[in-house]
Amino acid sequence: MRWSTTTLIAAAAVWIAASPAALSPREGGSRVAGVVRDVRGPVPNALVRVQATQLHTRTDSDGRFRLDGLPPGRAVTLTASALGYYNGGPVSARPGVTGVAIQLVRHVAEDNAGYEWVGARRAGAKTNCEECHSESDSASSLLPFDEWARDAHGTSAQNPRFLSMYNGTDLTGQHRSPVTRYSIHPDYGRAPLPPNPDQPDYGPGYMLDAPGNAGNCAACHAPAAAIAAPYSTDPNFVSGVGREGVTCDLCHKLWAVRLDSTTRVPPVNMPGVLSMGFRRPPAGHQLFIGPFDDAVGENTYSPLQNKSEFCAPCHFGQFWGVSVYNSFGEWQRSSYNDPVNGRTCQDCHMPRRGATRIARADKKGLQRAPGTIFSHLMPGAADVELLRRTVRLEVTAQRRQDRVEVEVRVTNENAGHHVPTDHPARNMLLLVDASDSGRQPLESVGTQVLPEWAGVGSAADDYAGRPGKAYAKVLEERWTGISPSAAYWRPTVVREDTRLPAKATDVTRYEFIAPASGEDVTITATVVFRRAFKSLAVRKGWQTADIKMATSSVVVRQAPR
């Protein structure tokens, strides 16, 4: 059976089927048996499942299957799946039946570049995802569209911070830094100059460096628009589905990811759609690729949907020979990549939140067990709760003569990559304070202090020179000497990388002058996360407060007299 695109959005695209009663294996129950075929004959190693349950089996070399342990007397709904085929079924069968036949149909094996993307949003789109995947109370909804609409992926093309970096403006877009000045180097040609201190400075911008050259930023930020022109798509001018950022249909057309055979990360200079392989169907047909092998209609199962490799194209980036962002590669090198005991990107960033449907019941959304549906509310660098579960902070202290000696241990406990990761403007700051019983600060006599980029000045969040440590990948621009730099499209070097790999612990030590009175001393350590270096955030007008990730205090009791 082939469905038209219009019919599909109302039915197959929402991964539907009749909802059977919940089933679990039963000792001594009845059996169903049968065969899975395509037009050429039996299909070996096909997966046959009692729909929306954990009961499943695989076909033998002759395409035959049998399912044991079914409750007797109750009809079950069977589906079948195999790589390269649309999911087959549903077929209803009562236990005891041995002649069940499930037909599989191959889906397209090539990509149709002329395919027109299905829009996520209802507005202006006859066929869309919101129609079936959204609740009226979207703020508390667990349905995919409602979660995606609140997620950064759904706004990646219109993210004002991204556009301010792309265009060289402040957050409002109304103020812009001057176009980059260049000098001519006798050996290397044009080289950018530092900003003119006599001119307004709203921070760097790709388009300031390369006016008229769109670059490849849209390959990740507006992939549906950039797929046909990854090097010439200007995010300022994308329209239609392209403005939906990492939109639903794009992810559910993703069939393969290109990884370098040696490095096992995407090839250099191939970000986003440049490292993605799609299966867009021909006119009059559909193909939705997802994590369920029992979603019938023009849907198919892909194991890639459950793997970290799915995320790799947009979470690895190398510029001018420098690895700028690489959360995927960091995960690969960590213990989280263990195939048995590890965790995927999806496990942490698409956590199962208890959803039981991926479409509304009135749209025939199939009811599933809680814990089987990935959330599309993908928490990341702006999610306070996620950040507060990331690091463990331990503080020990002792009084030694006229000094209080402190040791602080910061452990990347729950991130499967470095922390912080990806965008090089992100940084994490450890602050260590000591105070007497009257809450007066004690003088620090150690050399472990925060750098200038932690903030110079008298504001409460100007931390430069205070006891503590900064964790960041600090880039320095080769030609201008600017550091730290977030203009990673320029030639840079990694001046230092103090970030914490997965499960790593960093130990720092501090000394404070103890109160002469011998009174109690309180040591407080705090870890805060900043989405950008303070000077950059100020120039851009990004009003993002520090996020407190962890805090710990110890009291050194009064010295005995």
Q: Across the structure, where does each feature detected by a protein language model lie?
A:
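Beta-strand-rich domain onsets/edges
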Residues: 19-31, 38, 396-401
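Extracellular beta-sheet/turn segments enriched in Thr/Pro/Gly and aliphatic residues
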Residues: 23, 92-120
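Structural motif
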Residues: 29-46, 71
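Hydrophobic beta-strand segments
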Residues: 41, 46-50, 77-78, 432
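Short, acidic Ser/Thr/Gly-rich low-complexity loop/linker segments typical of extracellular
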Residues: 47, 53-69
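A short, solvent-exposed loop/turn motif at the edges and junctions
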Residues: 50, 75-92
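Short, surface-exposed loop/turn segments at beta-strand-coil junctions that are enriched for proline
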Residues: 72, 513-518
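Primarily the internal scaffold of c-type cytochrome electron-transfer domains
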Residues: 115-116, 139-204, 230-502, 510-514, ...
